[in-house]
């Protein structure tokens, strides 16, 4: 018989840097899950990823206090900022432009993110990412 699911917990955790401090500790503790077990398993699975890169993770909590988790790809905005070596987006995206990104760079990001996006193909994913870039105050070239 399948285990009874009692809830889902969505967090953004830096790769390889999961520890019991907030936000992880309180979120898992409320459901009675073993915090250190999650931290060790998460850090082990994210060894090959750039340390500190924020990764969305969905934790499924079961009635017997066990859990499973799925690690998703980094947020699009993080990948865009990394691609154009930007610290943060524009505070006023319409008037203040903070950088430029090319279609080729967006295609690279789209290939990485495609499995987590609801886009039919790479071209649709590129257009979605271009919208995210524009809302950050980044000029999109070649689209």
Swiss-Prot record:
GO MF annotations, alphabetized: large ribosomal subunit rRNA binding; structural constituent of ribosome
Keywords annotated in UniProt: Methylation, Ribonucleoprotein, Ribosomal protein, RNA-binding, rRNA-binding
Post-translational modification: One or more lysine residues are methylated.
SMART domains documented for this protein: RL11
This protein's GO CC annotations: cytosolic large ribosomal subunit
Entry's Gene Ontology BP terms: translation
Subunit structure as annotated in this protein's UniProt entry: Part of the ribosomal stalk of the 50S ribosomal subunit. Interacts with L10 and the large rRNA to form the base of the stalk. L10 forms an elongated spine to which L12 dimers bind in a sequential fashion forming a multimeric L10(L12)X complex.
Protein family according to the UniProt entry: Belongs to the universal ribosomal protein uL11 family.
UniProt protein name: Large ribosomal subunit protein uL11
Species for this entry: Paracidovorax citrulli (strain AAC00-1) (Acidovorax citrulli)
